[in-house]
Regions:
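Active-site-proximal gating segment of KS-fold condensing enzymes and close homologs
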Residues: 5-19, 45, 83-136, 176-177, ...
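Active-site-proximal alpha-helical scaffold in enzymes
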Residues: 50-63, 116, 120, 134-169, ...
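Glycine-centered flexible beta-alpha turn that most often forms the glycine-rich phosphate-binding loop
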Residues: 300
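A short glycine/serine-rich beta->alpha loop
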Residues: 36-43, 107-109, 134-137, 216-222, ...
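Phosphate/oxyanion-binding active-site loops and adjacent basic polyanion-contact surfaces
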Residues: 42-54, 112-116, 140-144, 224-228, ...
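Conserved active-site "lid/cap" helical segment
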Residues: 1-81, 147-150, 274-293
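Condensing-enzyme catalytic core mediating Claisen C-C bond formation in acyl metabolism
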Residues: 192-296
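Short glycine-aspartate micro-motif
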Residues: 78, 161-165, 247, 296
Length: 311
């Protein structure tokens, strides 16, 4: 939920609010602490969210995991999940890099648990208890799609029958916020107030954090938020045998957003290639008429002026 930054949780040193001046962030619901639901033992925030998110996915599946295990071999499970930027809070790489500078020392867990692919490894080893394939492809905002493509290919090749695809990110740290601020991609308080003035909105209450990110309209930047999401893929025969509720089919995955362009952080022609390939594949599957009348496009929606033209 996008709201004013909770200082005690995310900005104890005052870097984000006092130095950068960015008070809006997408935070977990107030009072919700995923580490209180299991023995977290100094787990980074994104890993805590992984455990909760994967547990929720299994619960929503509605089929006991032991029943699924009876139908497949232990190595027919695959997990593709992770973070795009890294786990940079004090229990991950943040603690690893800051400890000596703050007069302490790193723990034995900072390096290992801070790795971007730890989400997949943790799910495979500790939640599912499987010995199948794990992996993670980092691709900025398209990270989930890259992992989805690997999951699709694993099922199509026959190397896996049950695949978990997901991601977990907890980017509300001073270093990550500062990085997006330096790229002029962040909706900070100064830009928010300027935008509110242009839109003739009330300025007496200060920045309107809930409206900081405004995709597809007059906007000044994005808002960083923490999130965890997982989907479960199965081959057709396994889904039918288990009586699983089927929400959809992944017929194609394309991601060419990092194609030829003038700036690595800006949009490029790859966005159009991605869209064209997916639309062409959809037309093959459902036909031109249904493509035009029965489809839905979920646009990226970063809320940055540079991306507004392609989104």
């Amino acid at each position: 939920m996008v709201r004013k930054l909770e200082i005690d949780l995310y900005d104890q040193d005052g870097v984000i609010l006092d130095q950068i001046g960015a008070s809006a962030a997408g935070q977990l619901p107030k009072g919700f602490d995923p580490s209180s639901l299991y023995p977290a033992r100094q787990h980074p925030k994104a890993l805590q969210m992984t455990v909760f998110g994967m547990g929720d996915a299994l619960g929503q599946l509605g089929i006991d995991w032991k029943k699924i295990q009876e139908k497949i071999a232990p190595d027919e499970v695959a997990v593709f999940s992770g973070a795009a930027i890294g786990q940079l809070d004090s229990f991950g790489f943040g603690g690893l890099m800051q400890s000596r500078l703050k007069g302490s020392r790193a723990s034995s867990k900072n390096l290992a648990l801070g790795l971007v692919e730890m989400s997949a490894d943790f799910i495979n080893a500790y939640i599912l208890g499987s010995v199948g394939r794990t992996g993670h492809v980092v691709g900025a905002c398209a990270t989930f799609l890259y992992n989805l493509q690997m999951g699709k290919e694993a099922i199509e090749s026959g190397s896996a029958r049950f695949v978990v695809v997901g991601g977990s990110e907890a980017p509300i740290t001073p270093e990550i916020v500062d990085g997006f601020y330096a790229m002029s991609a962040l909706s900070d308080d100064k830009r928010m107030m300027e935008m509110q003035a242009q839109q003739n909105e009330n300025l007496s209450d200060g920045p309107h954090q809930e409206k900081a990110c405004r995709p597809f309209g007059q906007n000044v930047g994005m808002v960083l938020g923490e999130s965890s999401q997982f989907i479960i893929l199965m081959d057709d025969s396994l889904a039918i045998e288990l009586g699983a509720e089927v929400y959809g089919c992944v017929s194609a995955v394309s991601s060419h957003s990092d194609g030829f362009k003038s700036s690595i952080s800006g949009p490029g022609v790859g966005n159009y290639i991605t869209m064209a390939k997916c639309v062409a594949e959809a037309e093959k599957t459902i036909g031109s008429k249904k493509l035009r009348t029965r489809t839905f496009v979920h646009a990226h929606g970063t809320g940055t002026p540079a991306n507004r033209t392609t989104e």
